Amino acid sequence: MLKAKILFVGPCESGKTVLANFLTESSDITEYNPTQGVRILEFENPHVTSNNKGTGCEFELWDCGGDSKFESCWPALMKDAHGVVIVFNADIPSHLKEIEMWYSCFVQQQFLQDSHCMLVAHHKPGSGGERGSLALSPPLNKLKLVHSNLEEDPEEVRVEFIKYLKSIINSMSESRDREEMLIIT
């Protein structure tokens, strides 16, 4: 059984924990409490299997605190990560600049492929959820961008997240198959 480690990172108060709970069907949190360090959610998704073999997959979703005081922990969090989801609040202009740093640290410096990274512009309840195009600078403008509004259209982000998980698992499965072929030949 394949097991994938996915990091949820991004600025403080961007909605990482709320989104993580929703996508893993964990408990709801009604009041804001900043994540201290990291919170690990383990889950399976019946819609995601390994390369059409029907083999189930397990996931670890690492909900990482957005405060820079945890920066010294980041190398440990990044170890063996298969994917990174950068969550930001599209209604806070400074978040657009901050996500460049998150991308640099968690994707570029870890030599993760861009296809293993997804941006989520999370719109909080009552924010209006303006879905206009965001002015993302290169290389962020090449990444998959999903708008999340759990009040108005919760299933859109769930469907996109499942597609993302499938792409991670397919990549892991192909890599494992290549390694097995090298051993055989």
From Swiss-Prot:
BP terms from Gene Ontology: cilium assembly; intraciliary anterograde transport; intraciliary transport
Record-stated family: Belongs to the small GTPase superfamily. Rab family.
Subcellular location: Cell projection, Cilium
Domain of life: Eukaryota
Pfam families registered for this protein in UniProt: Roc (PF08477)
Residues where Phosphoserine is found: S137
UniProt cross-references to InterPro entries, sorted A to Z: P-loop_NTPase
Source organism of the structure: Mus musculus
Transmembrane annotation, as ranges: none
Function: Small GTPase-like component of the intraflagellar transport (IFT) complex B.
UniProtKB keywords: Cell projection, Cilium, GTP-binding, Nucleotide-binding, Phosphoprotein
Subunit structure: Component of the IFT complex B, at least composed of IFT20, IFT22, IFT25, IFT27, IFT46, IFT52, TRAF3IP1/IFT54, IFT57, IFT74, IFT80, IFT81, and IFT88. Interacts with IFT88. Interacts with CFAP61.
Gene Ontology CC terms, in alphabetical order: centrosome; cilium; intraciliary transport particle B
Residue positions binding GTP: 10-17, 63-67, 123-126
A single GO molecular function term of this UniProt record: GTP binding
Protein name in the entry: Intraflagellar transport protein 22 homolog
